């Protein structure tokens, strides 16, 4: 038979050493709280060593003792001692008084993990619950039943616009034409005379000044456009008039090149020069 086909019963037996963990923990000074012997009273071998795996955690004794109870597994395959990273809390016995069924030994079984409770598990559950509560808090308020648009918060109602009488508006306009800004005493006196509040007079003057500035800016812009159009018209009038149209060619000049050239130069001559030249010709 090949060495790789050997079963678990054909594995070589490891001889115990005198300074191992089993000998130190199983001394006479810890009769009740130390690490006890394994199943069948064996202190060495596969069932005598302490196992720290999760499946051996259900055998922990009361008051934080590390001694495994009967039914807990020992050393894993190969004689390796496993120490748990966290000490699990003791599991209370079942309510019916039935004996707890031990899970399968070794790390491959999952029966011992069913009832284990670690401190970090409680904190994780508490953290997840807090996060869920915080996430659902905006939706936990009371919502009105109906159309989705009806569930929205109704908008604030606007304050109705104050209307003044014709006599009040005329007096305010007359005062605004004389004085654009009012002092506190003048505003109070005008409000008392018109049977208005100080805030109403102040608001009316503010709105009227805004309207006055807008009208003034529009008037200035219109004047600027009118001035631009007037300047353009004056520039067009200041430009020289176009030249006279050329005279029809004389049939006599068409047969003489010199007379034809002289006739072509005649439109560029000024009226006074033409008159002087004609006068000189008549004198001669």
UniProtKB/Swiss-Prot annotation:
Residues 30-50 have a biased composition (Gly residues). GO terms for biological process: animal organ development; enteric nervous system development; mesoderm formation; negative regulation of dendrite morphogenesis; positive regulation of transcription by RNA polymerase II; regulation of transcription by RNA polymerase II. InterPro entries: HD, HD_metazoa, Homeobox_CS, Homeodomain-like_sf, TLX1/2/3. SUPFAM superfamilies: Homeodomain-like (SSF46689). Residues 1-50, 78-106, 139-166 are annotated as: Disordered. GO terms for molecular function: DNA-binding transcription activator activity, RNA polymerase II-specific; DNA-binding transcription factor activity, RNA polymerase II-specific; sequence-specific DNA binding; sequence-specific double-stranded DNA binding. Residues 157-216 bind DNA. Residues 87-96 have a biased composition (Pro residues). It holds the Pfam family Homeodomain. It comes from the Eukaryota. Keywords: Activator, Developmental protein, DNA-binding, Homeobox, Nucleus, Transcription, Transcription regulation. It is found in: Nucleus. The keyword Transferase does not apply. GO terms for cellular component: chromatin; cytoplasm; nucleus. Transcription activator that binds DNA elements with the consensus sequence 5'-CGGTAATTGG-3'. Binds DNA via its homeobox. Required for normal cell death of enteric neurons in the gastrointestinal tract. Required for normal development of the enteric nervous system, and for proper development of normal motility of the gastrointestinal tract. This is T-cell leukemia homeobox protein 2. It comes from Homo sapiens. The gene is TLX2.
